């Protein structure tokens, strides 16, 4: 079970009070080769805590513990908009010069991501379309920014992209079922209980330039053709009340594919 340390957790009046939608977990590395000693993670967490107005993530994986800075479930300032608003958990991997600590911190990194993916109902797929685990590089390539982490540091410590994807999907050295952590109690380790809304995978997307509405579970997406059907999902007809994510049409097409977002694939056609 991952040990979460709240020493550097932001307090009242600190950090964002905005809830994040449950679409991504963004993974980073600290990119700080000037901080590779035994206290690397605590140094990074302390700095983020004291400078949160500039940038912070929810957690920093160290060799001994995972140090929390931002409250999971809320927006953190780690990857820019719109990734921040879509990510209830973002985590940094600390740098170490000691190979044993490199390995230990990586194990904590993977375990924390898998545990939080289970809490927030996020698929354990890496850098793919729709919901899932996203590297900061994926965010830069597809949404905003120029950061390329964490692949360079991972390569340096002997972790390929394929290995990262396997470890996220199956756990370190394992072949467990997707979205299962090594210990069923581990998702409660930070004393966080998701509410019913946070367990809900289905949500609406509004393409603000084309005025199109879609419904998606983060993997499959369908166009909503009629106002009556849309009203069901918006609770106008006392049926559902789904959360809404607003995007440009090009963003929707890039994330799900133009074939998937074609209006000919409207939800009424099954």
UniProtKB/Swiss-Prot annotation:
Q: Where in the cell is it found?
A: Secreted
Which reaction equation describes what this protein catalyses?
A: Hydrolyzes the link between N-acetylmuramoyl residues and L-amino acid residues in certain cell-wall glycopeptides
GO BP, one example? cell wall organization
* Xref: Gene3D superfamilies: Peptidoglycan recognition protein-like (3.40.80.10)
Looking at the record, the residues that make up the N-acetylmuramoyl-L-alanine amidase domain are 22-151
GO CC terms: extracellular region
What EC designation does it have? 3.5.1.28
Which pairs of Cys residues are joined through disulfide bonds in the record?
Answer: none
State the UniProt keywords alphabetically: Antimicrobial, Bacteriolytic enzyme, Cell wall biogenesis/degradation, Hydrolase, Secreted
Record GO terms (molecular function): N-acetylmuramoyl-L-alanine amidase activity
Where it mainly occurs, coarsely classed, is secreted
Q: Which Pfam families does the UniProt entry name for this protein? A: Amidase_2 (PF01510)
Q: Which family does it belong to?
A: Belongs to the N-acetylmuramoyl-L-alanine amidase 2 family.
Could you tell me what this protein is called? N-acetylmuramoyl-L-alanine amidase
What organism is the protein native to?
Lactococcus phage r1t (Bacteriophage r1t)
């Amino acid at each position: 079970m991952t040990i979460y340390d709240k020493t550097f957790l932001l307090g009242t009046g600190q950090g964002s009070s905005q809830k994040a939608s449950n679409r991504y977990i963004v993974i980073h590395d600290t990119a700080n080769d000037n901080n590779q000693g035994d206290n690397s993670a605590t140094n990074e967490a302390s700095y983020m805590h004291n400078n949160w107005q500039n940038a912070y993530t929810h957690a920093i994986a160290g060799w001994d513990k995972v140090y929390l800075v931002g409250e999971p479930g809320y927006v953190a300032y780690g990857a820019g908009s719109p990734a921040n608003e879509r990510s209830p958990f973002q985590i940094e991997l600390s740098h170490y010069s000691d190979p044993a600590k490199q390995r230990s911190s990586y194990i904590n990194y993977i375990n924390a991501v898998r545990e939080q993916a289970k809490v927030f109902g996020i698929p354990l797929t890496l850098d793919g379309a729709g919901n899932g685990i996203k590297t900061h590089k994926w965010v830069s390539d597809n949404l905003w920014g120029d950061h390329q982490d964490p692949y360079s540091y991972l390569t340096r410590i002997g972790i390929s992209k394929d290995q990262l994807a396997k470890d996220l999907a199956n756990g370190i050295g394992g072949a467990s079922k997707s979205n299962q952590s090594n210990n069923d109690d581990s998702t409660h380790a930070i004393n966080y209980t998701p509410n019913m809304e946070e367990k809900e995978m289905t949500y609406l997307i509004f393409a603000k330039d084309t005025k199109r509405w879609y419904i998606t579970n983060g993997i499959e997406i369908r166009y909503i053709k009629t106002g009556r059907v849309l009203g069901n999902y918006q609770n106008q007809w006392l049926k559902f009340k789904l959360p809404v994510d607003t995007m440009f049409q090009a963003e929707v097409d890039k994330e799900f594919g133009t074939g998937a977002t074609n209006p000919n694939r409207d939800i009424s056609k099954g």
